[in-house]
Amino acid sequence: MIRIFLTGYMGAGKTTLGKALARELHIPFIDLDWYIEERFHKTVGELFSERGEASFRELEKNMLHEVGEFEDVVISTGGGAPCFFDNMEYMNRVGTTVFLDVDPKVLFSRLRVAKQQRPILQGKKDDELLDFIVQALEKRAPFYRQANYIYCADKLEDRSQIETSVQQLRKLLNLHIAS
């Protein structure tokens, strides 16, 4: 049974690598944010705004526990999910966790072009964006680093790099993957 949780900051490549890894392993991929949006028929941003952070994080935890019961699956979490309640401990208990570690400057270059799709980043100037990323990573790193594995996901700029990363992840997780 395979149950892999990909964690990391927004823009780390959780969805990109998760889809590619799941395809390689011939198992389903679940993006926790998409799962929540599908269930509640609202975007994560709308749910966050309407319910407030505490209520949203409780909902997120419940949905994490729901998908955490699925077998033979790759799951990407929201960037904040590992940092609340006992979510990291839970994921480590029921599956294999991988923290996609990305240099803040690489995250900056990825998020800079995707600012409009991420409400929390809209309106931030370049220097503010980099500071925001660095500060958020400092707060979240202690949670992310509780993952079973840490994988440097700096190089995901084209199909070849994604494929290389998938093969490296397969090797890294070899003890847990028998496909």
Swiss-Prot record:
Q: Name one GO biological process term.
A: aromatic amino acid family biosynthetic process
Q: Which Pfam families match?
A: SKI (PF01202)
Q: Pathway, per Swiss-Prot/TrEMBL?
A: Metabolic intermediate biosynthesis; chorismate biosynthesis; chorismate from D-erythrose 4-phosphate and phosphoenolpyruvate: step 5/7
Q: Major location, coarse class?
A: cytoplasm
- The reaction(s) this protein catalyses: shikimate + ATP = 3-phosphoshikimate + ADP + H(+)
Q: Which CDD domains match?
A: SK
> What remark does the entry make about the cofactor?
Binds 1 Mg(2+) ion per subunit.
**Residues that hold ATP according to the record:** G11, A12, G13, K14, T15, T16, R118
Q: Provide the residue positions that the database annotates as binding substrate.
A: D33, R57, G79, R140
What EC number is given for this enzyme? 2.7.1.71
Cofactor(s) named in the record: Mg(2+)
| Molecular functions (GO terms) | ATP binding; magnesium ion binding; shikimate kinase activity
The superkingdom of the source organism is: Bacteria
Q: Which GO terms describe its cellular component?
A: cytosol
Query: What's the top EC group for this one?
Result: transferase
**What keyword terms does UniProt attach to this protein?**
Amino-acid biosynthesis, Aromatic amino acid biosynthesis, ATP-binding, Cytoplasm, Kinase, Magnesium, Metal-binding, Nucleotide-binding, Transferase
Give the UniProt subcellular location, in the record's own words.
Cytoplasm
Q: Which PANTHER family match?
A: SHIKIMATE KINASE (PTHR21087), SHIKIMATE KINASE 1, CHLOROPLASTIC (PTHR21087:SF16)
Q: How does it assemble?
A: Monomer.
Q: Which HAMAP family match?
A: Shikimate_kinase
Q: What does this protein do?
A: Catalyzes the specific phosphorylation of the 3-hydroxyl group of shikimic acid using ATP as a cosubstrate.
Recorded family membership:
Belongs to the shikimate kinase family.
Tell me the protein's name. Shikimate kinase
Task: Give the classification, highest ranks.
Answer: Bacteria, Pseudomonadati, Bacteroidota, Bacteroidia, Bacteroidales
> Gene encoding this chain?
aroK
